[in-house]
């Protein structure tokens, strides 16, 4: 699975929740890392940092794993605001960070994200070059359209979209267009389907619409998965992204999800 680190920097006057200094955002992500490391010491998780480790862990789960087999995880950063400067990227890589999504919501230090406009910042372009050098995977989720196409033109390393649905089914900037999905498929990316209800069904109004009103069920996500399969002509690019990480509850998930 993907284990996420996340902490947003916000400038004064920005209404989004976050921290007013990148250094504090960095400290927040290090607390999250400490939790994952504690879970690993307890034998519940196993961090995957290279192909050899991934192969070994997959083999464990494919060959009658014990009941207490640890869950393997790849460490990923959602929104790069907490990377204070590029020297911090080296430090993060040393702790096992293997994927970064430069954007999240609103304006970002490296890239604007959901609800914002524009392309990569100058610092963002340098970040992408350093990701390329280190072999850090690009998570395209949350990128604006402009940032998406810009980054695809300057980065040729591994790509995925960790939690992403289809704009042709749910019209919104947060989803990807067919052209973007085709580009990800061309890049051999994996696209994780997101289970946030407003991304699953059209016309959702946050804080007002309910899953029951829309008939949003777990099976609804199959429409998005199938759409990606039809574009790709194969199932190999589809995964479960979920996004069910505690940021919202059953008021914003499929009506038959009870946990």
Regions found by a protein language model. Name each.
Residues 1-118, 122, 171-259:
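N-terminal hydrophobic targeting/anchoring segments and the immediately downstream early-domain regions
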Residues 145-146, 166-168, 197-200:
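Short, catalytically relevant binding-site loops at active-site mouths
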Residues 155, 166-167, 252:
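Charged catalytic cores and adjacent phosphate/nucleic-acid-binding surfaces used
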Residues 29, 119-134, 151-161:
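Alpha-helix-loop-beta-strand connector modules within alpha/beta enzyme cores
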Residues 136-143:
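Catalytic beta/alpha-barrel core
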Residues 97-99, 134-136, 154-160, 186-190:
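Glycine-enriched alpha-helix->loop->beta-strand junction motifs that scaffold or abut catalytic
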Residues 85, 146-149:
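Short, well-ordered alpha-helical microsegments
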Residues 143, 161-164:
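Histidine-centered catalytic micro-motifs
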């Amino acid at each position: 699975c993907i284990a996420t680190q996340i902490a947003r920097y916000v400038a004064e006057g920005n209404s989004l929740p976050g921290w007013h200094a990148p250094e504090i955002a960095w400290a927040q992500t290090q607390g999250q890392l400490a939790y994952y490391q504690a879970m690993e010491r307890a034998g519940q998780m196993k961090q995957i940092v290279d192909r050899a480790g991934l192969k070994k862990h997959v083999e464990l789960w494919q060959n009658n794993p014990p009941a207490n087999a640890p869950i393997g995880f790849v460490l990923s950063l959602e929104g790069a605001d907490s990377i204070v400067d590029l020297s911090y990227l080296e430090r993060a890589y040393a702790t096992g960070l293997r994927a970064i999504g430069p954007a999240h919501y609103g304006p970002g230090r490296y890239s604007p994200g959901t609800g914002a406009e524009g392309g990569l910042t100058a610092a963002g372009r340098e970040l992408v070059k350093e990701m390329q050098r280190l072999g850090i995977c690009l998570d395209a989720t949350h990128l604006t359209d402009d940032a998406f196409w810009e980054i695809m033109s300057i980065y040729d390393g591994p790509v995925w979209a960790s939690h992403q649905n289809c704009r042709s089914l749910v019209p919104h900037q947060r989803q990807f267009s067919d052209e973007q999905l085709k580009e990800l498929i061309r890049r051999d990316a994996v696209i994780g389907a997101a289970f946030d209800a407003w991304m699953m069904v059209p016309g959702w109004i946050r804080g007002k619409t309910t899953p029951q009103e829309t008939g949003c069920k777990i099976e609804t996500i199959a429409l998005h998965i199938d759409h990606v399969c039809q574009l790709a002509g194969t199932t190999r690019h589809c995964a479960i992204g979920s996004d069910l990480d505690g940021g919202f509850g059953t008021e914003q998930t499929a009506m038959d999800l009870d946990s």
